[in-house]
């Protein structure tokens, strides 16, 4: 049995606290906060804020703190931590405690190790807190310096400390420690940028977006800084400018709000676990099934750990015999890249292939190689990063009411030869399939072992996908399916990762370039038989297929699969609404359990739930995507969706604000312009009356308006005010929706000169009269 607890540590100069929240209790209290399918949904979508707060009071929780002058809770704190040690109950059942935190792997766990190390080795609580504060500063100052963080003797000693509990870091599980990347302008180095707990809470639609803030230093607090040599004798204004909030002394009257802030953070961790429990559970299942430890691993890291285990088994080599190697390349000739069976039938494509064969490149980044080629009416870009067609926005609807045979289920015929469907031909696990079928492998690894491993995993994935059994090879089917998906999908990316064990840029090119050329072979053959391809990307194409052409299509498909040794599924669109390759919504015609259904898939600006699918993504007014979806799929006016909405958080926006900035509200009061400093992470919606919010550079004072200069209302702390009283600027959200709808309806790209055309013809696709008026 595992006792699951969320926790968080806070440290100031004269203050140390830990707050614990029982995950089991939290899940029980909010077990009814699910949708019609039983899937967990944000609390605000089910409960009022008043009800959320009332229920949070019922959750089992424990908070402890100590200060220079109050150590009354120290022994209780230590006792609580020690009781997380694994033990057997009276029935002989092993009881284990897992503590869940956010960035706890690199901070909170180390702080608890320091607490347990020093509490019996210091002469006073003040000395203990000073040690803990110094430890905190060391950890924080080292986190931007990877080498120091890994090699610091003191930090390494804390890492080796045997904690009584098992730590689980949700930040690492969801890859929030590497949520985005910035490129150093001087060195060109790509540096990961983490996403903090407050930013993440916005994606959860958490009701309380609370940053830790203390009132300005007053006279009472200022006296305490005389103990600090470099601050001694400074006046209050100087102290307020120089002392960071985490380097403050906390006065007794500020402890209660501090503990509330701490508790709110822990509740957010608990909410992540509630909303994404399957992802958390998968780490336990994988760890148990494969005897590995992935409790603190993202999917990418999990793939590394599993690949190491699998490859060592397939090759017969111990990890230390093959890890740490890579293959460096200088010049890479496409003559060594392109497979010999790549052939084209038309002169333009033959010339294109000849050009490719003469190419030599020296790197594999996006701009290393790029060529355009036209087949039929579509222009395609072939590049190191993948194939894509140069598409205008489209709205496509299949005719008839019935289906062709589909890999997603069911078999029906369209009505007559002139009926057509738009189909998506999708290559099954394209890159892994190329690797396995055509023996593509890093030169420093055993080719047969590598390719047989990838091929075996791919085939096993197909078996698991179609299995009705609860277990496959003695492993839970869902766990095995996830393992196979994680490892297979990661392999190609690892080939191009310079610091990884699979690095070989020639293997990257053999996979991507041949994949694109094989796709173009298929496109050419279809166009030669008057079957038109409308769009293409790396592993799939969109085709308009008439019933009369189905036999020709199947013959071309079979021949192509035999030549390339690849397989593809054919899925049938009911509709496809696309702004571009990364922003679309579609409905597929499927049959499930004998019932005709439409399966919705959407992405980017057309997916109302994009913010919840990937916590590394930002959060931007999901109501707009919902209005766009309703407009196309339900023929519902945009303004109707906006005005019928009940959740104000669906209208909210946020923007990333770097540490070099702070945020200010600019308002006019009694004819005077005033600037009020806000917390750095703000959640706001565009309103008719409100304030302008700006990013202000801490050093030079430069200002940058947020929300495109619109007036907004900040709503960091949600209340139960009726949405009709929120003074929402519906015109703003309507215009944002039309920025997506207009290009699609007009079939004009919003890039370049298309912007002016869209503005000129905006709304001109709407009929003046309803067709029903004419009988």
Predicted regions and their residues:
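Two-metal-ion RNase H-like nuclease active-site motif
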Residues: 2-11, 169, 423-425
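Active-site cores of enzymes that catalyze phosphoryl transfer or operate on phosphate-rich substrates
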Residues: 4-18, 455-505
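Short His-Asn-centered micro-motif
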Residues: 7-9, 68-70, 101-104, 425, ...
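Conserved DEDDh/DEDDy metal-dependent 3′-5′ exonuclease domain
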Residues: 33-196
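Conserved "right-hand" nucleotidyltransferase catalytic core of DNA-directed polymerases
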Residues: 43, 185-192, 202-428, 517, ...
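Short active-site loop/helix that positions an aromatic residue
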Residues: 107-118, 428-442
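C-terminal, non-catalytic extensions of nucleic-acid polymerases
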Residues: 338, 343, 384, 392-393, ...
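Charge-dense polyanion-binding interfaces
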Residues: 443-483, 555-579
């Amino acid at each position: 049995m595992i006792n699951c607890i969320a926790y968080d540590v806070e440290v100031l100069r004269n203050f140390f606290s830990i707050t614990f929240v029982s995950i089991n209790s939290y899940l029980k209290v909010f077990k009814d906060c699910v949708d019609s399918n039983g899937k967990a949904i944000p609390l605000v979508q089910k409960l009022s804020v008043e009800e959320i707060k009332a229920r949070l009071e019922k959750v089992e929780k424990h908070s402890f703190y100590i200060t220079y002058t109050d150590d009354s809770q120290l022994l209780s704190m230590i006792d609580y931590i020690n009781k997380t040690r694994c033990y057997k109950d009276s029935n002989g059942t092993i009881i284990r405690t897992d503590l869940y935190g956010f960035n706890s792997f690199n901070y909170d766990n180390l702080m608890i190790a320091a607490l347990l190390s020093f509490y019996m080795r210091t002469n006073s609580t003040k000395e203990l807190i000073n040690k803990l504060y110094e430890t905190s500063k060391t950890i924080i100052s080292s986190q931007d310096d990877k080498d120091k963080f890994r090699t610091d003797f003191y930090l390494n000693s804390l890492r080796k400390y045997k904690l009584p509990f098992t730590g689980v870091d949700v930040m690492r599980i969801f890859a929030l420690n590497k949520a985005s990347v910035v490129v150093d302008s001087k060195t060109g180095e790509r540096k990961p940028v983490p996403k903090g707990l407050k930013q993440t809470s916005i994606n959860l639609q958490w009701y309380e977006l609370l940053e830790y803030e203390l009132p300005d230093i007053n006279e009472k607090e200022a006296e305490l800084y005389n103990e600090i040599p470099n601050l001694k004798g400074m006046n209050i204004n100087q102290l307020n400018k120089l002392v960071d909030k985490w380097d403050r002394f906390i006065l007794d009257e500020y402890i209660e709000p501090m503990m509330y802030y701490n508790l709110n953070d822990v509740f957010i961790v608990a909410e992540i676990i509630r909303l994404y429990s399957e992802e958390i559970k998968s780490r336990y299942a994988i760890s148990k099934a494969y005897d590995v430890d992935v409790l603190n691993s993202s999917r990418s890291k999990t793939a590394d750990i599993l690949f190491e285990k699998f490859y060592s088994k397939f090759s017969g080599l111990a990890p230390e015999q093959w890890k740490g190697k890579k293959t460096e390349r200088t010049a890479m000739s496409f003559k060594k890249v392109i497979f010999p069976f790549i052939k084209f039938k038309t002169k333009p494509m033959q010339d294109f292939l000849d050009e490719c064969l003469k190419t030599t490149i020296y790197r594999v980044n996006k701009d290393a190689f790029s060529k355009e080629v036209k087949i039929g009416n579509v222009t395609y870009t072939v590049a190191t990063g993948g194939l894509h067609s140069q598409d205008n926005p489209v709205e496509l609807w299949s005719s008839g009411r019935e289906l062709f045979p589909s890999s997603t289920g069911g078999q029906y015929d369209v009505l007559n030869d002139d009926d057509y469907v738009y189909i998506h031909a999708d290559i099954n696990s394209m890159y892994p399939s190329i690797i396995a079928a055509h023996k593509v492998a890093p030169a420093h690894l055993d080719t047969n072992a590598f390719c047989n491993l990838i091929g075996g995993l791919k085939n096993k994935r197909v078996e698991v996908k179609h299995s009705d059994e609860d277990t496959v090879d003695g492993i839970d089917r869902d766990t095995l399916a996830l393992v196979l998906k994680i490892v297979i999908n990661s392999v190609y990316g690892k080939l191009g990762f310079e610091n990884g064990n699979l690095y070989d840029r020639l293997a990257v090119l053999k996979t991507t370039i041949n994949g694109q050329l094989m796709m173009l072979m298929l496109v050419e053959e279809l166009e030669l038989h008057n079957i038109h391809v409308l769009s293409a990307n790396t592993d799939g194409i969109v085709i308009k297929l008439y019933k009369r052409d189905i036999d020709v299509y199947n013959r071309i498909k079979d021949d192509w699969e035999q030549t390339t040794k690849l397989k593809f599924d054919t899925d049938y669109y009911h509709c496809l609404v696309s702004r571009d390759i990364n922003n679309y919504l579609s409905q597929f015609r499927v049959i499930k359990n004998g019932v005709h259904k439409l399966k919705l898939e959407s992405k980017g600006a057309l997916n109302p739930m994009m913010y919840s699918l990937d916590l590394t993504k930002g959060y931007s007014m999901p109501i707009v995507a919902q209005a766009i979806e309703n407009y196309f799929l339900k023929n519902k006016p945009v303004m109707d969706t906006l005005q019928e909405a009940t959740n104000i958080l669906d209208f909210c926006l946020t923007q990333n604000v770097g540490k070099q900035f702070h945020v200010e509200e600019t308002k006019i009061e009694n004819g005077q312009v005033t600037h009020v400093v806000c917390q750095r992470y703000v959640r706001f919606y565009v309103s008719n009356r409100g304030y302008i919010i700006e990013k202000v550079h801490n050093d030079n004072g430069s200002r940058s308006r947020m929300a495109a200069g619109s007036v907004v209302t900040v709503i960091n702390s949600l209340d139960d005010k009726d949405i009709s009283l929120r003074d929402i600027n519906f015109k703003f959200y309507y215009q944002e929706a039309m920025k997506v709808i207009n290009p699609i309806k007009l079939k004009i790209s919003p890039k370049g000169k298309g912007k002016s055309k869209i503005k000129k013809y905006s709304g001109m696709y709407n009929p003046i009269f309803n067709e029903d008026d004419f009988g």
